[in-house]
């Protein structure tokens, strides 16, 4: 796994991952109710204190209407990262819409999750190729990428 050993911004982390980390295609969509399945891949690495992720999405007409932290970003074009640091069944769910608005929770299952404090969520560095402003579905854009650095 790629290791970044200095301080950085989210765009710098994305460049580092592009140079140092292999790309992994995602071909599993867990939500059958969503028929649209864009091409998605990602790169992952870490620093001493952050998980570094870069998602690449194509074949999508991105939409980002949700603007509040821990809002229902699943209604927008979004990506997810699940992380379980211990073998106790508790996991973290990090969801981001295409402009980087996060929804972050932890717990043992989908119906038993607690939202992370918005002040803590705001420490996640994010950088989207689409910027950070809300957007409606756009026919002129068919791909986007998102870099996140999770403390």
PLM region spans:
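Structural preference for beta-rich elements and adjacent junctions enriched in aromatics
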Residues: 1-151
